[in-house]
Structure formats: structure tokens, C-alpha cells
């Protein structure tokens, strides 16, 4: 690593972390001003506000914008270098444009690795503490319940359906269990007006139970006023964790997706997008670094202002495309991988074009 490499890396990282520091301070002030009434109303201890909320708020809010911070930082210090003819001097010394990109790639790869580890492990663990704090003092809500018309496959031969689930008292109304043979044919059906979860026995107590058993063309019917059943289903399984996907580390998130798939639950596409997003965002840092460097390395009459304006447009387009692809993946059947990676795939061609036409 040459002196110029160290110089550029130092400029890159110092500018980046200064931008992060400024944004963090502004974000904390704005968030605190919005939540101070809740904190005072609930008489939240200062220690908990600092250590349980803001200590975990900072990584979460920063991780969302690290790619944009990278783009702005690269454009800012590279544009200054270009205006001071530093980039031109390096090129005149015999270094190629791609050689100048090396320290940029080293620094951005370091940030991408930190972001990758944060997305997959560190931030979700912090979000567990932050969300618990918010549920206790701010929003005061627990997990959102799946209320109406629930259909779950417990295994290949057992399906449970619930007309309405009451989370507050763990009662499932319109409770039914269907059994299937290896050919997928219905062989028995149990229907109850309601089923109440029994914590002591870890079972469901059904009331006004009707059981039908099918054997070819023959059908038998039984009725019970009350009947307990032990199945692989608990009240916690009747919970929609859409707002809690950020609290699960990636291994836990993948495990949850597999469990939901086995149950036959189809509404977990957003979770699959989340898994891919955690890997795509760090790669975005490298892509936007290359774009910012290619744009700002050329000395222009407009100076830093025009470079920052172009960077702002690119950042806005990247965000819009990311939101658009995520929505398509969640609601329109686009594969979750493409939903998370499509902006990177599109903008990598922008990188190729800019680098090929950059100042040599």
C-alpha cells in the first residue's frame, strides 16, 4: 500500500464517519423531540433511555443510510481533490484510473464488511432490546395477531383452520382440524365452536366438538361437549411477525421462514426479501463508491456543487428502484432475490459505463 493509498483511505473514512456523526446527532435530537412526551408520561429512567433505546437506535438508523453516506462522502472529498488537481497529478504520474480506484475499493470493502456483520447479527440483537423498550413504554403493543381465517399445515397430514383468533384470552373460534392420508385425501375432520389454550397441560380444550371420519364411502360421526387435543400448535404460532423481522438474526430468520413454509403459510415473502436485503446493502456501498469516485474525479466548472447534485439524483433513483423492486417482490411475485438485488444489478452497469468513460 502506497502513501497515496493511505492518504485516500484516510480521507474516505474520516469524511464518512464525520458525516455519520453529524447525521446521528441530528437524528437523535429529532427522535428525542418526538418521543419526549412518551418518556415523561411513562417516567422512563434516563439509564434505560440511553442504554436500551438510543444505544440500539443509533446502529439501526445509521445502517439504513450507510450506502448514501458513502456516496456523499466519496463525492465530497474526491471532488475537492479534483478541484485541487490532486487526481490529475496522480494520473500524470503514470497511475491509471483503475489503480486510483484501489484505495476506494479497500475502504468501501471495509465498510461493507462491517455493514454485513451488523445487518445479519449485531443490529437484530440490538433491535430485540429496542423493540422490547418501545413495547413497554411507547407503543405498548405486543406481537400483531393473525385474527381472521387462519390456515396452517402442522405436517404433511394435518391442517388446522381457525375462523377467528382472540389473542387477549388465547381462544380460537371456529376451530377445526383436518387429517389427510398419503394421497392427500381427507380422512377425518374435527370441528369445534372454540378451542381454549390450556397453559398447564400445553393443549387445546375444544368445546362443542364434532368429529367426522371418512372411510371410502362410509362416514362416522361423533359429538363431544368438551375434548382436549395435543397438537403442534401454540398461541405464539398464531402471531404475525412482520414488524419483528428486524429483531431476528439471519439464522433465526431463515429458521422462521422454513417453519412457516412447512405450515403452508404463504405470507413470508417479505421475510425472504429481508434476508437478501441484509446482504445486498453492503454490496451497495461498493457500487456507490465506484459511482461517486467516477463522477467526482473529473474537474468541472460547477465544482463540488454539480457533483453533489448528480450524487443526490443517483441516490434518489437508487432508493426509488429499491422500494419499487421490494414492493414487486412482496406483492407482485417477483423473486425475493431480485427484489433485494435488482438496484445493484442495474447500477453495476452504470459503474461499468462510468469507469470506461472516466478521466484517464
Language-model features: where?
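Extended beta-sheet lipid-handling architectures
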Residues: 8, 172, 190-192, 204-211
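Soluble periplasmic/extracytoplasmic beta-strand elements of cell-envelope proteins
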Residues: 151-152, 159-161, 176, 205
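Extended lipid/amphipathic-ligand handling interfaces
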Residues: 162-164, 192-198
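Extracytoplasmic/periplasmic/luminal assembly and interaction segments
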Residues: 163-183
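Short, solvent-exposed aromatic-acidic interface loops
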Residues: 178-182, 208-216
Amino acid at each position: 500500500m502506497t502513501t497515496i493509498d493511505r492518504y485516500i483511505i484516510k480521507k474516505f473514512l474520516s469524511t464518512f464517519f464525520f458525516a455519520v456523526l453529524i447525521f446521528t446527532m441530528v437524528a437523535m435530537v429529532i427522535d428525542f423531540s418526538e418521543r419526549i412526551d412518551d418518556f415523561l408520561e411513562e417516567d422512563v429512567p434516563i439509564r434505560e433511555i440511553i442504554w436500551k433505546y438510543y444505544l440500539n437506535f443509533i446502529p439501526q438508523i445509521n445502517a439504513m443510510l450507510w450506502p448514501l453516506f458513502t456516496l456523499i462522502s466519496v463525492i465530497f472529498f474526491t471532488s475537492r481533490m479534483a478541484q485541487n488537481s490532486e487526481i490529475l497529478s496522480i494520473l500524470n504520474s503514470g497511475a491509471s484510473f483503475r489503480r486510483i480506484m484501489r484505495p476506494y475499493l479497500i475502504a468501501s470493502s471495509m465498510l461493507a464488511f462491517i455493514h454485513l456483520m451488523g445487518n445479519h447479527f449485531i443490529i437484530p440483537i440490538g433491535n430485540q432490546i429496542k423493540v422490547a423498550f418501545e413495547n413497554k413504554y411507547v407503543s405498548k403493543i405486543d406481537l400483531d395477531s393473525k385474527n381472521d381465517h387462519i390456515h396452517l399445515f402442522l405436517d404433511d397430514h394435518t391442517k388446522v383452520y381457525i375462523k377467528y383468533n382472540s389473542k387477549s384470552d388465547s381462544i380460537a373460534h371456529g376451530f377445526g382440524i383436518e387429517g389427510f392420508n398419503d394421497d392427500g385425501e381427507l380422512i377425518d375432520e374435527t370441528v369445534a365452536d372454540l378451542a381454549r389454550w390450556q397453559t398447564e397441560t400445553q393443549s387445546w380444550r375444544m368445546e362443542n366438538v364434532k368429529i367426522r371420519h371418512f372411510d371410502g364411502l362410509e362416514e362416522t360421526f361423533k359429538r363431544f361437549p368438551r375434548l382436549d387435543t395435543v397438537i403442534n400448535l401454540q398461541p405464539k404460532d398464531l402471531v404475525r411477525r412482520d414488524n419483528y423481522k428486524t429483531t431476528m438474526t439471519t439464522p433465526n430468520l431463515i429458521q422462521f421462514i422454513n417453519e412457516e413454509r412447512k405450515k403452508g403459510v404463504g405470507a413470508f415473502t417479505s421475510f425472504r426479501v429481508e434476508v437478501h436485503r441484509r446482504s445486498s446493502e453492503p454490496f451497495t456501498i461498493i457500487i456507490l463508491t465506484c459511482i461517486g469516485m467516477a463522477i467526482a474525479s473529473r474537474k468541472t466548472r460547477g465544482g463540488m456543487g454539480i457533483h453533489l447534485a448528480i450524487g443526490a439524483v443517483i441516490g434518489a433513483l437508487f432508493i426509488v428502484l429499491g422500494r419499487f423492486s421490494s414492493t414487486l417482490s412482496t406483492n407482485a411475485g417477483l423473486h425475493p432475490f431480485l427484489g433485494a438485488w435488482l438496484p445493484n444489478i442495474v447500477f453495476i452497469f452504470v459503474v461499468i459505463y462510468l469507469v470506461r468513460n472516466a478521466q484517464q
